[in-house]
Amino acid sequence: MNNIWWQTKGQGNVHLVLLHGWGLNAEVWRCIDEELSSHFTLHLVDLPGFGRSRGFGAMSLADMAEAVLRQAPDKAIWLGWSLGGLVASQIALTHPERVQALVTVASSPCFSARDEWPGIKPDVLAGFQQQLSDDFQRTVERFLALQTMGTETARQDARALKKTVLALPMPEVDVLNGGLEILKTVDLRQPLQNVFMPFLRLYGYLDGLVPRKVVPMLDKLWPHSESYIFAKAAHAPFISHPAEFCRMLVALKQRV
């Protein structure tokens, strides 16, 4: 069995598992891991096929969630950013007894635009899939640039993301393609109506991948959840607003 790369830091009485987004790895959390590990027992994870979790091919969302769960603490707050938000949500749906609280960051239950649902146009995601086979390093860099556009610190935030990608070997093309397929096809809007643990959704006002229009729609669909929009953030609020981001998680800890 292939192993997921997993690092544990801190001795807090609440476990917090962080799941990164598409094309990246757990190094993306280095800007906040010291602060968070002073409040939580923090778990940094490379999703299957990404970063140091080698030897995995393309996986379905359900298989990815099960692979991550095998090495997880019995109970934790699960936080997922972007694609990682879908993985954390899937775990909350299938193993609610393992999830003290669910936090999604710049994530959508349905990334792909549908009828009367704002999101990434399916042909844009299909275009990324096509370009992966031509020049996958450049494609990943383009995707990262999209994530920070519009913020006051866009250039340095994009550099931080690129540094994260380059710190470790690139994922295999089929893994990247499989991740895009999840973003293109998965729709958890209805299933997540049945999640009743504390559920915090964090967004960036300037996010070009998860439009802020989805926030009031999901407030209505999931009245038991809470949402918060970082006014000057894009797709990576923990990089552009680390102190504010950590404060929200510490406040959540008091409630679980």
Swiss-Prot record:
One of its GO terms (cellular component) is cytoplasm. One of its GO terms (molecular function) is pimelyl-[acyl-carrier protein] methyl ester esterase activity. InterPro entries: AB_hydrolase_1 (IPR000073), AB_hydrolase_fold (IPR029058), BioH (IPR010076), Carboxylesterase_BioH (IPR050228). It is found in: Cytoplasm. Its EC number is 3.1.1.85. Keywords: Biotin biosynthesis, Cytoplasm, Hydrolase, Serine esterase. It comes from the Bacteria. It is an enzyme of class 3 (hydrolase). The active site is at S82, D207, H235. Pathway: Cofactor biosynthesis; biotin biosynthesis. It catalyses: 6-carboxyhexanoyl-[ACP] methyl ester + H2O = 6-carboxyhexanoyl-[ACP] + methanol + H(+). Residues 15-242 form the AB hydrolase-1 domain. The physiological role of BioH is to remove the methyl group introduced by BioC when the pimeloyl moiety is complete. It allows to synthesize pimeloyl-ACP via the fatty acid synthetic pathway through the hydrolysis of the ester bonds of pimeloyl-ACP esters. This is Pimeloyl-[acyl-carrier protein] methyl ester esterase. The gene is bioH.
